[in-house]
């Protein structure tokens, strides 16, 4: 399904009973978080707060609060069908050479579709209906949430940050939270390996004394938002991927103050710069771990201009102990990851990121084991193949007779197929999320791999146990008898 913009998506959700308009006055300071959190935990609807206390701009919350709504936002009708998107990304990430002329012709439409999905620049856009510049810029006029009692202040939580490194044609889109510290000042909290931070670092090396242009889109269409959090190949822009999801090119408009291109249908666009050397302490804020993060210093984003629709909608969320919206996104995107991993490692049967593991900190992999030590190869592959799993602390690998998504099955495999000394892999001094206060050094910590597979000769000298299974004919006979037994 195609959505022209965020409002079109809101309309469809409302028709499906997946969006609730809240007319009662609700405070963006803490109250919205509590309401959204209770709603998400009940797998409830997206919420449009039409009367935020002290503000005239409505707030959209809990938009991606169920995996089903994430799938809808990506143009799919079910979470299961997201695997087709994963297969497309796997093909684009590592396209195999054609096996012959017929195979080449069969793949040509896919390549043509991708090549034709570059963004389309338009000369006028709804996101520039109203222009606010200079001293008129006042971010305090927007209903930016303060999510938790111990937060340092209001936090922009769904910003689509648009950057471009020096001499690069491709723009980067990423979601990096921003703390409000002044009428025109936000702290840009991006991790050092993320695309925006890499663009900024390259800019400083090439232009050390010049300000770095940045644009931030708030309330883009769902395909563009979700494209920014999907493992898109480096050769494919997030705008092009959003076009593939949508079935139409992403319309963009050139920013007034820079050459950056923002989504034309966005509700609000912040234009500005990061001045060389301007940093500020960020935090603490309640995070997706369920804890407040420690204070750290990040660049300051100076907003020089705001462009927006005449009556904009502010898109917001909160993060906290799972389940929260990032955890729900992780559940849905899990289905996208599976085909990408299977393309590189065909022996993988399933891959699961338990939402209780803060979206990415633990992974469970089931596989068709083929040789001794195979599980360890898969562990290393998970940690190294996709940058999304750079921070995954625990990888559990087991055989394909185990259901990766059933903890009873997984715990059974761990406790019956593992020797702790032999089957535990420890890797020290690896990149770790700086929010992980359990690591001994900020940004650097260890990883653990658990080989819960059946052991082959060479891995053990003992006779390995055989799993107990009832004969199929006995099970069939009991099925026929069951209604006569009076047990149910």
From Swiss-Prot:
Topological type in the membrane: Peripheral membrane protein
UniProt keyword list: Cell membrane, Decarboxylase, Flavoprotein, FMN, Lyase, Manganese, Membrane, Metal-binding, Ubiquinone biosynthesis
Entry annotated with the keyword Manganese: yes
Active site: 287 (proton donor)
Keyword Acyltransferase: no
Cofactor detail note: Binds 1 prenylated FMN per subunit.
Location relative to the cell: Cell membrane
Residues where prenylated FMN binds: 175-177, 189-191, 194-195
One GO CC term on file: cytosol
Cofactor: prenylated FMN; Mn(2+)
Enzyme nomenclature, EC number: 4.1.1.98
Function description: Catalyzes the decarboxylation of 3-octaprenyl-4-hydroxy benzoate to 2-octaprenylphenol, an intermediate step in ubiquinone biosynthesis.
Family: Belongs to the UbiD family.
Subunit structure and binding partners: Homohexamer.
Name of the protein in question: 3-octaprenyl-4-hydroxybenzoate carboxy-lyase
Organism: Hahella chejuensis (strain KCTC 2396)
